[in-house]
A protein has these predicted regions:
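Short, Lys/Arg-enriched N-terminal segments with co-localized hydrophobic residues
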Residues: 1-9
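Thiol/selenol-based redox catalytic cores and closely related redox-interacting motifs
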Residues: 41-123
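A structure-centric signal for secondary-structure junctions around beta-strands
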Residues: 8-10, 98-99
Length: 123
């Protein structure tokens, strides 16, 4: 079982607990009484196989959070040469570069938080 696998009853939210967007997603799920668990990259880690699963679902370009502080502080050469072949290694080394939260459940995939998308996915 990879890190992005989601069982039938428990929704796993992948992200970082102090991220405002993750907080919004967690609040929305709690407000709608949807059972969930946070998988915090800082606490629980993140492996390359899991990143590969997310990349297959969303594409590497959609996993990179170019609005993050980590992106702004990333070496310019890494930014310029970032490609499909290098992205997963860069993301594994810098998990705060991953757009969040990520939820995969029974064929549904969500990245980021949009109340409208969550409403459609969970109702």
């Amino acid at each position: 079982m990879g890190i992005f696998y989601l069982g039938e009853t428990m929704i796993i939210v992948y992200g970082i607990k102090n991220c405002d967007t993750v907080k919004k997603a967690l609040k929305w799920l709690a407000d709608h009484q949807i059972e969930h668990k946070l998988h915090d990259y800082h606490v629980d880690g993140l492996d390359k196989a899991s990143l590969q699963q997310a990349e297959a679902q969303f594409g590497w370009e959609n996993l990179v959070n170019k609005r993050s502080t980590t992106w702004r502080n990333l070496d310019e050469q890494i930014k310029k040469t970032l490609s499909k072949s290098t992205a997963l290694s860069v993301l594994a080394d810098n998990p705060t570069l991953i757009k969040r939260p990520i939820i995969l459940q029974e064929g549904k995939a969500l990245i980021g938080f949009s109340e409208k998308e969550y409403q459609a996915a969970f109702n």
